[in-house]
């Protein structure tokens, strides 16, 4: 798989404008997860952000999204 640098996208979470840099693979996985859950992309990101800020040592938002997606993929693999 060829390497693609991160792509920065802007959005709004809890009334605050923010930008997130993720590799295209993660953007694609995040869009798929949002579609499966019937959520707009910003709502999915907000959900992950809410989980992130409850952590004892919260990671950055981009890292939290990557970790959330990896955990979701691992969970789906275990159930298949």
What are these regions, as identified by a protein language model?
Residues 19, 23, 64-67:
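Short, electropositive, low-hydrophobicity segments enriched in small/polar residues
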Residues 19, 41-42, 55-62:
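Alpha-helix N-cap/helix-initiation sites
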Residues 34, 45, 69-73:
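Amphipathic alpha-helical interface segments used for dimerization/assembly
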Residues 57-80:
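C-terminal structural segments of small proteins and small subunits
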């Amino acid at each position: 798989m060829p390497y693609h640098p991160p792509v920065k996208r802007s959005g709004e979470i809890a009334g605050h404008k923010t930008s997130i840099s993720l590799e295209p693979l993660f953007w694609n996985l995040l869009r798929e997860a949002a579609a499966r859950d019937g959520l707009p992309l910003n709502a999915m990101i907000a959900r992950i952000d809410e989980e992130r800020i409850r952590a004892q040592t919260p990671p950055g938002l981009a890292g939290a999204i990557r970790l959330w997606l990896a955990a979701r993929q691992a969970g789906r693999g275990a159930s298949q």
